[in-house]
């Protein structure tokens, strides 16, 4: 085991290099670190370590376990590591002052600062995110982004039992609330001692900007309401998203839908997602264009995308807000029984929108994906939701990120796809493959045996996985991309002028 003083010196050195602290802070920081290890003396160490940031942090955690300061449990180790890094962080007020000082230079300067801080403080778990499998694969709609999510570690049985028997608390109310800023964490609530938020004003309300601890794309940020209020999509949503992109034109912003099945995993707290990433949907081609009376300054088109989407372009924020709101209101009450689209059943609302906003070539671009969450006997999880035949790949809600063409697929697929590759190489029998994958594996075998001499196995499986993800998205499209669906889509866009 490494010497504690040498590890403390190394962490201080790394934090200086990452601009978390300055030379003047060395003694203070060292003493605070000694304190949490219950040490009251320090001897300079001749040994100079060259460990990486995460290696150093992990060795410090091992010493804390050895000294019985913490339990050898994931939640306890995470809480302790956040407490360590919190020592290196300024208070929220100082971080906000620095953010806006840099914002006066440029919006990108301010987000670069906050993003770097969030990584250097280990709030963004770059070590765990690096475990994800990411690749791009072609499809009939363009190149798709595929991620097999391996970043979130699984809890062990002991931890699960502790969580089950723990006293429930309503503080913080949810994972997004402002009360998470600096929160110690428990066995049931993640560590947030090293968590900081930037205060924003959007549409005369206070919002918070933070980064996701488990990024799915570059600079994946969350914009959350100061108040714990439920998700909703209305005119204020469009005002907020456009206001955010106006303030940070290098970022996009979007919202999950506000209804179950088609919404995100957190419906209890109003929030948006954003970041500095170009999604496959951004490059979708025009399907047809149309116009809306009274909005001559707004370009309108439907795009060629598996989830039925209207794209608006314009320079005037007010016009885009009103045009988006008109489309939302029309869609809320729109039904087309020939396509299984019903806006209400037994007074339950089914229609909503997943909106995304970005700035491109001096114009704002608003993408409005039309969603419907109705269920049926044939499709009890949702008519416009991944159907049973694709559940072996993805059965969860299709939220904002997936709508835009980035698949976030379960970690189990890593080993399962390797088995399928072994089967395609004739190394194992079909019986060795999970039962829910077998129909797909048989289908792939026929294709691969035909193409074997002309294709790489990994590329082949990646492309087929991308095609399966496209099927997931197509199931969610309310207007299918066939003659009947296209006519239905045009009926809806025509109704915008009625």
Swiss-Prot record:
Pathway: Carbohydrate metabolism; galactose metabolism
GO MF, any single term: UDP-glucose:hexose-1-phosphate uridylyltransferase activity
Compartment annotation: Cytoplasm
EC number: 2.7.7.12
GO BP, sorted A to Z: galactose metabolic process
InterPro entries: GalP_uridyl_Trfase_II (IPR000766), GalP_uridyl_Trfase_II_CS (IPR023425), GalP_Utransf_C (IPR005850), GalP_Utransf_N (IPR005849)
Catalytic activity: alpha-D-galactose 1-phosphate + UDP-alpha-D-glucose = alpha-D-glucose 1-phosphate + UDP-alpha-D-galactose
Alphabetical list of PROSITE patterns matching this protein: GAL_P_UDP_TRANSF_II (PS01163)
GO CC terms: cytoplasm
Keywords tagged on the record: Carbohydrate metabolism, Cytoplasm, Galactose metabolism, Nucleotidyltransferase, Transferase
Pfam family, one: GalP_UDP_tr_C
EC main group: transferase
Family: Belongs to the galactose-1-phosphate uridylyltransferase type 2 family.
UniProt xrefs under NCBIfam families: PRK05270.1-2
Official protein name in the record: Galactose-1-phosphate uridylyltransferase
Organism of origin: Clostridium perfringens (strain SM101 / Type A)
